[in-house]
Amino acid sequence: MERYTMLRFLDAGESHGKAMMSIIDGIPSNFKVDIDFINNELKRRQKCYGRGGRMKIEKDKIQFLSGLRGTMTTGNPITMAIYNNDSPNWEKILSGEVKKDEKITIPRPGHGDLVGYFKYGTGDIRDSIERTSARETSIRTAVGALCKQILKGIGIEVRSKVYSIGNLFDEKVDLFDQCKYKKIDNSLLRCYNEEVEKSFVKKIDICREQGETIGGTVFLSVRGVPIGLGSYSQWDRKLDALLSYAIMSLQGVKAIEFGNGMNLNLRGSTFNDEILYEKGKFKRPTNNCGGIESGVSNGENIEMKVYIKPIPSIKKNIRTVNLRNRKETTTRYERSDVSAVVPASIVLENIVAFEILKEILNKFPSDEYYELKRNISHYRGTIYLR
C-alpha cells in the first residue's frame, strides 16, 4: 500500500511541447507566494556556464492556473505552467505526421532512447527523448521554489554549490556564511575559489571543443531542520532514503553521499559524531553522518554530495545500432549542454526543498500556513524538555 503524504505533485509536458506543467496538492492555505522569487529560481537554473543553445531561446516564467487567489494560496490544488518558446518550431515534428524514414531509430548510449523505444513501442525514439529530457527540471524547480518560500518562513534553508567538475575540486565552505554564499551564487560555475573557477571554465571549454561532455559533484546543505524528521519505524520512512529517492530521480544523478559517508579511512571512534550539551541544546562537534542518524534528522545541517554523470548527448562519435535495420552505426547528436552540473545544483536545491517540506507536513499536518508555524514553533520550543 502506498504511503499517504500530505504533500504531493505530478508534472507533465514534453521538452518541445507547448508547456511544462505541474499540479501540487497539499500546500497550506493563506501563504503569500512571491512569484518573482520563483522566476528568479528559474533564471538561476538557466544562466549557468556550459549551457547549450536552448537556453538562448527559452525565457522561463511561471504561470499559476489554479490554487491562488491573487498571490495567496487557498488550500486547493495548485496548477503551474511554464510555456516553451521553442514549441512552434517543433509542431510538425511532434504532430504525429512524421514519415517512417523521418522517425528516430538510432539510440544514444547513456540516454533513455533504447529502453524507451522497447518499453513503449511507439517506433520513434523522439517520444522518449521528449520526456526524458532535462527540460522537465524547469517545472520541478518551480515546484521546489514554492516550497523553499514556505520553509524559509519556518526557519529552514536549502543551499548548494558545485564541488567538482570532472577531477577538479573546489573548497568546502560554510554555505550559510552570507558573504561566501553570495560569492558562490555570483560565480559562473557556482564555486568559491576564483582560481578553481578558471580551471572549471577551461575544462568545460576543452570538452566543448572535443565534442565531449563532463560531469561533476554538487554539495548541498539544509539548515534549520529540527530533530525528529523521518522515522526508523519502517524502511520507507527514513529521511535519508526519502531524500535519496527524490535526488536519484534527477536526470544524470548516479550517486549520493550523506556527510562523510564515502570516507572509508575513518574508524568508528572518529566517524561517530560526539554528542555535547550546551545552553539547553544538543550539539555535535562534527557532522560525518550528514545530519541524519538511523533515518531521522538529528538537528545538525543535512549535508549531501550528489554525483552527476556526463550528459549522454555528445558530438563525438561512439558506436550504437540503428534499430531499423539492426546494423552498427555511430551516434546522432541531439542539441544539449556541455555540462549539467551547475544547473543541477539549482534543481537539486528545489528537489530537496520539496522533500523536506513534504516530511515537515507529514510530521506537522497543517491545512493553513499559520497553523504550521504555530505547530513547528511549539515543537522547537519543547522538544528538548522531554
UniProtKB/Swiss-Prot annotation:
Q: What is its EC number?
A: 4.2.3.5
Required cofactor names: FMNH2
Residues binding NADP(+) are 45, 51
Look up the record and report any one GO term of the cellular component aspect: cytosol
Per UniProt, the cofactor note for this protein states: Reduced FMN (FMNH(2)).
The Gene Ontology terms for molecular function here are:
chorismate synthase activity; FMN binding
Q: Which reaction does it catalyse?
A: 5-O-(1-carboxyvinyl)-3-phosphoshikimate = chorismate + phosphate
Biological role stated in the UniProt entry: This reaction introduces a second double bond into the aromatic ring system.
Q: How does it assemble?
A: Homotetramer.
Q: Which family does it belong to?
A: Belongs to the chorismate synthase family.
Q: What is this protein called?
A: Chorismate synthase
Specify the species. Answer: Clostridium tetani (strain Massachusetts / E88)
